[in-house]
C-alpha cells in the first residue's frame, strides 16, 4: 500500500485545523496561495487567533508552503477554500476552481481528492471533475478518486470541536479506497458518516446552515413584532419554552462566512430546476434587515 501523503489546500478557519489534526499522524503539506499567511504560520503565528504556537509546531516532513511544486509528492488532497458570494448574491467558486486547477497540474494515478468547501450540489462531480480531467498526465476519471466532505467547524467553539463533530464523507470508490479515506479522516473526526451520493452530501451542508438561518429569522421577526406591539420579547419566549418541543433560538445579527451565504447557494441550486425557495429567501430578507432595525433602536436610545 502506498504511503498516504496528504495535502491541505487553503489554510484558513477550515483548512488549518484539518492540517493540525493530520500532522499528528502524517507528513502533511499545508498549501495556501497567500504568502503572508504561510510566512506567519512558519513562525508559529495564527492571525485568526485560533491556535497557539505549540499547535503550529511541525515535526517530521510536514511543511507550510505557497509553492505548487511542493504538493507534487502528495496523493491525498483536501480542498478547503472560501466560497463567497459574487454580485447579486450568486455563488462564487473562483477559489475552488483555482485550487482544482493547481491539483490538475500534479494529479497522478490513484490520487484521492476531497472538496470540503460549501458548494451547490453537482459542483464536485461535474465542475471540479471537469477541471481535473484537463490534467497534463492524461489521467482519466477511472484513475483517480474524487469525493466531498462538508466542513462543520465552528470557530471559537471549544465544546463542539473538530474531533467530536461527526463528519459526512462521500466518494465514488471501492471499499479499499473508502477504508483509506476513513484512515485519514478518522484523525480529523471520531465519527465518520458515509453518504452514498456526493450531491446529497453537498446539499446536506447547505440545509444545515439554512435551517439555522431560518430559525434565527423567525426569532427576529417575533422580536420586531413584540417591539411594535410593546410586548416583552424575552417574557414571550420564556413562556413558549414551557412547551416541551419548543426550540429556542436567539434573535440578532447573522454574520460570518456561512449563514448569510449558504441560503443563496441553496436558492441558486433550486432555481436551476425553475423552483424558487420562497421561505429560504424570506428568512434571508428578514435577517438582512436586522442591521437597520438595531441601528434605529440604538439611535432612539441616544
Q: What are the functions of these language-model segments?
A:
Residues 85-152:
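Rossmann-like NAD(P)(H) cofactor-binding subdomain of soluble oxidoreductases
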Residues 21-22:
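Aromatic pocket-lining residues of Rossmann-like dinucleotide-binding sites
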